[in-house]
Amino acid sequence: MMAVALMCCSPIMAQKKHSGMCAKQAMQADGIVRLSKIEVHPQYLDEYMKFATEVGEVSLRTEPGVLTMYAVNDKENPCLITILETYASQEAYKQHIASAHFQKYKQGTLHMVKSLQLCDQKPLNPANQLNNYME
């Protein structure tokens, strides 16, 4: 499995191509910073993680407007998953959720998800940009 790491970078860096990824757009004024809080039924956790890993990797590799996909799970309860997602713009998000790889993830995991909260965030320092890179 590939390691996914998170790094901070300037808006100029956000436009550069990182190893294994397409060139990234800079965050626009209407960009999205979101925490997706997901609770997965325990019996589906392993299967869910396969879907989530695939959609994250494909999104970062192929979608210029998907800037960050960083998933973590709770140390005490691994069925509680939080994903930090950043999108360059509202349009980039619309393109992401319409993509074949996202639809495969969404339809394939509907029965696995016990609860979902989408929590949009406001950056404290908009000059800081987040971007992922893959090794």
Region locations from a protein language model:
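Short alpha-helical
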Residues: 43, 54, 76-78, 88, ...
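N-terminal start-of-chain detector that recognizes signal peptides
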Residues: 39-45, 53-58, 66, 89-93, ...
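Glycine-rich beta-strand-turn "strand-cap" elements at beta-sheet edges
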Residues: 10-30, 70-77, 106-135
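Bacterial N-terminal signal peptides
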Residues: 1-9
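Short, well-ordered beta-strand segments in beta-rich or mixed alpha/beta enzyme
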Residues: 31-39, 68-97, 119
